[in-house]
Each structure stands twice: as structure tokens, then as C-alpha cells.
Amino acid sequence: MNHSTAMTFPIKHLALLSLVLLGLSAELGAQVSPELADDGRVTFRCRADHADRVAVHGQFGAAVELEKDSSGTWSGSTTTPVKPGVYEYRFKIDGRDSIDSRNPHIKPQRWPNTSILHIASTPPAPWDIQDIPHGTIHRHSYHSKVLEQDRELIVYTPPGMTDEKLPVLYLAHGYSDNQRTWTEHGKAHSILDSLIHEKKAVPMIIVMPDAHAIDPGGKKFNAYAPKNTEAFSRELLEDVIPFVESHYPVNPASTHRAFAGLSMGGHHALFLALSHSENFSYVGAFSAAPPAIPDLSPQDITAINKNLRLLWIACGDKDFLFARNQAFHAKIKELNIESDYQITPAADHSWPVWRDYLIDFTPKLFR
């Protein structure tokens, strides 16, 4: 028997928790980190009594060098305003990386550990918490028969969900991340709340599994990926999808099922598109690390084009995987496999790009 435990987090409660944490931080006065000033600059603080040098490295610009006061607290501010957005950052204390211990918002990932700086926009961006109906985040523990181990997955259900059967998007993370990263850092739930509220996307369930079916154990990606993708795909089809369809009001038809992923998750997506297209009608690959293309017969190619209503591939021209995406797209085009290929100018391999890709991709689903 497949046992499950679940925890459910209404998104409005998560927003309230953030406000409580901000209130507690305010009471600590000078201990707040990060602290956003009215002019848009951000101040960081760190206690490191015996350190000789402390700096902050983040996605928001140049490194910030901190100075120590008489109490042993290091502090420093960005020299220019930080634009609204969601950023990763870390302290470098005498050359060693550290999270911001005063900031409760930590990016879920296997390595390296980073803290999250979220500056809301005016008006709100899709990834900001807004005063609109919110869905619910569920966290499930389950036993995988394929992998013979206990696993975890995250499920987003849209606001106002009833017993009506809904389509499902299976959404995979990248190599250094885990099943919680798409919500806690990618803000997938807030993005879908916004798109559904604006009627840009249809109500759907999003399932975010652990895309590491095999522990990477420090292996380089190219050596690790083929076996991991085979194991993940089998677990997805034999454990995860049946689990979801037995616990949620889901339309089980492949026409109501999509898969997307970023980087390593994009590797999974393209593998599924070419090898298991009968199970999905929509596939999205965001900044993918493309897999090897299997030997495909004319009949295989006909089936792929028939099964997939959309094969959406996107990559930035500043991404280190751009050349591989170019080569992959050229090869499937040569094979007459239909796809929608998007090149994003000046985009690199980072979460701001992938949030935008989720915003672009989900409105195309289940129409």
C-alpha cells in the first residue's frame, strides 16, 4: 500500500507569516538583514567577531563590502537602488560562503546555500503576493515502489478548486535544486495565482516532484544525467502520476497533462518528449541541458508530432547551454519534429529567466 502524509499551506497564511517575520525583524532594529531603504538601496548585516573580511555576493549587482563596528557586527549597503525582483545572495566570510542568518528566507537546494532577497514591484509582478484569490500548497511524503525509498513532492492547487477534474502540469527543478525550489524561490504558486486571476491561464494543478531519482553524489552532470533521467521518468510514470491521480481531481487523459522543467528538468522534459510522448500533450524545456536524441523511426517521429500539441523550447543567448540548445533544435528540425523554439536576448542561466518562461509557457496549456 502506498502511504502518504501531507501538509497543506494556504498561500494567504504564508503571506501572513512573512509579515509577522518582518515585524519581528523590525523589533530587532539594527539587527535587520536585509533591510530595504526608502531610496531602494539594501543594507546587509552579519555578526562575525573574528573575521577579517566580509562581503555580500548576489544577483542584484556588484559585491557589497561590509565594515565591522565595535560590537563585531558587519554592515554595508548597495551603492545604487536594487530593482524589484527575487534575488539570491550569500555572505563571503574570509572566503567562505554563508547564508544570512538573520533572513529566514533560504533557497531550497542541494548546494550551495543562498538566501533570498524579494523586493516587491509597484504594481505587483506576477511572482509577488497580491490581494487576489490564492491557491494552496500541499507537501506530500510517499513511498516510491520504483526507487524503493520514501520521497517528497509539492502540489499546488488553484483557488476555488472543486471536484471538477483539472489538467496537471508536472514541473521539474534543476540540478542543484529540489522539489521545494519552484515554490519557495521560483514563486510558481504566485505566478499561477496571478495568471489564473487575469484569465491568462486556465486553472490547473502543478506537481513539483524531486527530479533527483538518484543521489548525484558529486558526479558531473553529463555522467549522472542518463541514469538519473531513466530512473526519474520511470518513477514519474509508475509512482508520481498514479499517486497524484488517486489523491486529486485530475483528468487522466494525456491531453490534460503537461511536463516542463528547467536545466536538468529541461533534460527530463526533452527525454520525455522524444521517448514517452504518448503520456503528455505539452512539453516545455527551459534553458535545458538537452539529452542525446535516440534513434527514431519515421513512425516514431509521426507519433511525437501527433501526441505533442506543443513542444516549447526556450533558452537565452547568454546561457552557457545556448550552443547545446541550438544544436538540439537544429537536429530535431532536421528530423521534422515540430517545436516552438524561443531565443531570449541577453538572458542567462538564472531564476529571473525561468520565472518569465513559466509566465510565457503556462498560458499556452490546455486550450
Regions found by a protein language model. Give the residues of each.
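Bacterial N-terminal signal peptides that target proteins for export
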Residues: N2-L16
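Residue-level micro-sites within transmembrane alpha helices that shape
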Residues: I11-K12, A26, E238, H267
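Bacterial N-terminal signal peptides
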Residues: A15-A26
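Boundary at the C-terminal end of the N-terminal hydrophobic targeting segment
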Residues: L28-A30
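Non-catalytic cap/lid and distal C-terminal segments of serine-dependent acyl enzymes
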Residues: L36-V64, K68-R367
